[in-house]
């Protein structure tokens, strides 16, 4: 159920740079961040067990991305601090959709593409964080009646996602051991440690995929 969620400036991605590969400004999202825009930019992030939802309204010309770590916070009360809850998909998706609506998007026109939910580390398989995130994002969007146009979820690999909100194009690179996955593995181990010491574990189209060896394009 959508609520009146305020904008969260502290959670808006601020890492901007010029991407020479795509010849345009890029915004890099870290975990617990989101970004919405009407500009012709590329939004990028790297995912392990985390999930990103890329949502846009083609008619309104606005789109955005988020990056969340866990499905839901069942222990959160009504007085929760939203600025510390963007790690949870329930809040991250709520904020993203509400910000798009504020920019002129219409709920019935929203289109989503979702990525991530990988089991990057062997010891993470028992926690099923990636699977839970993947299940959650699909269930949430179905409940909110947001059409999922494409998905690349689960599996044993990390992903680098580049999303163009103006056109809806999503490029997904499935990272291999030859790619730089050190940062991802560090984050996954930290998440695994945090969950293993917690008294409560979290509750249970069209994409272009490319690796260093091969590139496959599926029409958008």
UniProtKB/Swiss-Prot annotation:
InterPro entries found in the cross-reference section: CheD-like_sf, Chemorcpt_Glu_NH3ase_CheD, Cytotoxic_necrot_fac-like_cat
This enzyme's EC code(s): 3.5.1.44
UniProt record similarity statement: Belongs to the CheD family.
Keyword Hydrolase: yes
GO MF term (any one): protein-glutamine glutaminase activity
GO biological process terms, semicolon-separated: chemotaxis
Name the UniProt record assigns to this protein: Probable chemoreceptor glutamine deamidase CheD
Keywords: Chemotaxis, Hydrolase, Plasmid
Catalytic activity: L-glutaminyl-[protein] + H2O = L-glutamyl-[protein] + NH4(+)
Gene from which the chain derives: cheD
């Amino acid at each position: 159920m959508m609520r009146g969620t305020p904008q969260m400036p502290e959670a808006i991605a601020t890492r901007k740079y010029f991407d020479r590969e795509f010849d345009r400004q890029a915004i890099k999202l870290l975990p617990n961040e989101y970004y919405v825009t009407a500009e012709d930019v590329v939004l990028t992030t790297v995912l392990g067990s985390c999930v990103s939802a890329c949502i846009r309204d083609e008619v309104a010309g606005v789109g955005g991305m988020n990056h969340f770590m866990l499905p839901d916070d069942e222990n959160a009360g009504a007085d929760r601090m939203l600025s510390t809850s963007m790690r949870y998909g329930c809040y991250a998706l709520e904020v993203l959709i509400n910000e798009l609506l504020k920019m002129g998007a219409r709920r019935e026109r929203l289109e989503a593409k979702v990525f991530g939910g990988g089991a990057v580390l062997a010891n993470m398989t028992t926690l099923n964080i990636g699977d839970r995130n993947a299940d959650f994002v699909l269930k949430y969007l179905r409940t909110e009646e947001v059409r999922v146009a494409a998905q690349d979820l689960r599996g044993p690999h990390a992903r680098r996602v580049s999303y163009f909100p103006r056109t809806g194009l999503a490029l997904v690179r499935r990272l291999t051991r030859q790619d730089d996955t050190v940062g991802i593995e560090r984050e996954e181990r930290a998440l695994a440690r945090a969950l293993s010491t917690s008294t409560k574990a979290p509750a249970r189209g069209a994409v272009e995929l490319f690796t260093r060896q091969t590139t496959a394009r599926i029409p958008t």
